[in-house]
Amino acid sequence: MPAANQASPVQPDYVVSAVGMVSPVGANATQTFTSVRANLSRKRECPQVFECRAEDPDSEPAEPLVASAIGHLTTSERDQEQPARWLAFLAAHAFSDLWENASFSTEPNQSIGLYCSLPKDRPAFGVSNQPEFLSRFHDLVGKDAFAVEHFEFGHSGTALGLCEMARAHLREGRIRHAIVGGADSYLFSQWLNPLDENYRIKSTRNLDGFCPGETAAFLLLEEESQARQRGLVPWATLAGASKTNRVASIAGHDAGEALANAIKPLLSDQASSPLLLCDLNGERDRFKGWGYALSRLRTRLTPPVALEHPAMVLGDVGAATGAVLIALGVRFLHTKYRERDHALIWCASDSGERNALLLRRHTSPTGGPFDLSGGNPCP
């Protein structure tokens, strides 16, 4: 049986008022969303980064890595021996995009909290690299320390959990604005080697694998009144969050039970199912887990089920995934999926954590249609 559900209902009083991103398919959130919506990817061979093992090394040459790599930014920061500098570079670009969209002017740093997910379980990278990351990040964005700066080394769903921490700090009055996000890149040879060795990376030798990617994304959480004071119309309201942990059975998996238990508390009896955004990345086990979970949820999800898995375009973006899904999800609710009132985001991390978060599409106080022509949406 899976671990006891740790659902924590969230009162719908904090909104997503701005987002920022940088990715292989966009220099900002708007470009990235446009590319993801159109299924336009930039996956390419990257032999200078890594070469995957051949099925028969004695008779076949190594195969160039196919990855979703950022090529529109200067690569001078991409030092194979200093991944923290590159991650800080990506984070700074996404942060700057958010800052511009948030319409901040003279907002003091002491009213802002920064929450960032960084990769865990990577060779020669961890908590000891946080000072280097933070120093470089502050230099690049040109800002001093914020009131709260919390960095968590985790996996695809970590940023969803950070939204809960940020919400708590907002309610406690420690901050007025919470900037939550993540940055990750698999494109370092010392990180790719063990993944390739263990048949995780997609190649001719291993068709059941994922395409490595790199991205950074941030979102701004605050009270609606704070956003409107700066002339912004919020994208969505944070409406709920849930978390469970997988406990493997004798068969080696939990048949999707933990994931289903993370999602169930966030599903209502409304006529239409929410838009689903997830971290499916091409690996068979993750797809099987979702298939099992879907069968358990069949009475709670009203057809047709709408599912978006951006890794098809961006590749697997690791610890940045949760923030990426939120940043894309709020836009999907106002464009491609306007008939859906909610977006449910779920992540199934390698560590066994199953995170889910619910967003409610924002409407004006009068209940009228969302104005796409002005304010924050679709800048």
PLM-predicted stretches and their roles:
Residues R176-D196, K243-G252, C278-G291, V305-D341, ...:
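Acyl-CoA/ACP chain-elongation machinery
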Residues L73-S96, H150-G161, T204-A217, G240-S268, ...:
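Active-site pocket-shaping loop/turn-to-helix segments
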Residues P9-S23, A29-A67, T74-T75, E197-Q270, ...:
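Condensing-enzyme catalytic core mediating Claisen C-C bond formation in acyl metabolism
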Residues V15-V16, L40-F153, Y186, L266-L301:
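Conserved beta-ketoacyl condensing-enzyme motif
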Residues F151-G181, E214-R230, D316-R338:
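Active-site-proximal alpha-helical scaffold in enzymes
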Residues F33, A92, S96, P131-S135, ...:
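Predominant activation on well-ordered alpha-helical scaffold segments within soluble catalytic domains
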